[in-house]
Design a protein with these regions (language model features):
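Intrinsically disordered, low-complexity terminal regions
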Residues: 1-248
Length: 248
């Protein structure tokens, strides 16, 4: 732990006032609260080395959280700052103004950002993501995915279960879906869904101002034992594209 800016008196004082305790396997770090209207309590930079799989719970008014390596369950919140993780267990991540990025989350993922980008390479579990202003990118998710976005584009690479997405302004694209239900809604934006080869699709799609492009072709119904995905897509102004997924 050290002052964020060497020689800054407020930062030096903040470092001196920071309390560190360790008891029964629990490490606690508390920095001083902002004092007065200006809230000029100084800033510190803290580096903690933990065993793999450690559980982490942290909050900050202003500050970033960065983690390398594998962690256990994580609960992190910051009013103003980014959250950058490598691999974690179940995660609850929140920032009012900042980006959230993670390589892999094992378990339930709950991610909220007021204004920023969200990018997760892989979620092995279900996920609930809310983004008021910014793009959201999920490469792969194995469980049910729920997305709520006000302004921003949504990209999902591979979805292995249900997907429900609702946005006000922005495009939504799911590159590959194999089974389950897909429910996409946007007020303004294009919707694009790639159906895995060999999967039958039951479509319920509508756009008020735009065009529906269905590249799957007509079918009498799915073959016996075939995977089926039910698609419901609605856009007020934009196109809807239903196509076969590209091989991964």
């Amino acid at each position: 732990m050290h002052p964020r800016t060497e020689g800054d008196e407020a930062d030096l004082q903040a470092a001196r006032d920071t309390k560190v305790t360790f008891s029964r396997g629990r490490l606690t770090i508390r920095t001083p609260k902002a004092a007065g209207r200006r809230g000029d309590s100084g800033s510190v930079a803290i580096e903690v080395r933990l065993p793999n799989g450690s559980r982490v719970n942290g909050s900050a008014a202003t500050g970033d959280f960065t983690a390398d390596g594998s962690l256990g369950e994580c609960t992190l919140a910051t009013m103003d700052g980014d959250i950058r993780l490598d691999r974690t267990g179940p995660a609850r991540l929140r920032t009012e103004r900042g980006d959230v990025t993670a390589k892999r989350i094992d378990g339930m993922a709950e991610i909220v950002t007021g204004s920023g980008q969200v990018r997760v390479d892989e979620i092995d579990g279900a996920a609930e993501i809310k983004n008021s202003n910014g793009n959201t990118w999920i490469d792969q998710v194995t469980g049910a995915l729920h997305l709520k976005v006000a302004n921003g584009n949504i990209f999902v690479g591979q979805a292995h279960a249900d997907v429900a997405s609702k946005s006000a302004n922005g495009d939504t694209r799911i590159e590959q879906v194999t089974r389950g239900r897909v429910d996409l809604q946007t007020r303004t934006g294009d919707l694009e869904i790639g159906i895995n080869l060999g999967t039958a699709a039951l479509l319920d799609v509508n756009c008020q101002a735009g065009t529906v492009h269905n590249a799957l072709g007509a079918s009498d119904g799915p073959d016996k034992g075939a995977q089926t995905v039910r698609v419901r897509a609605r856009t007020g102004a934009g196109d809807i594209v239903i196509r076969r997924a590209q091989p991964v």
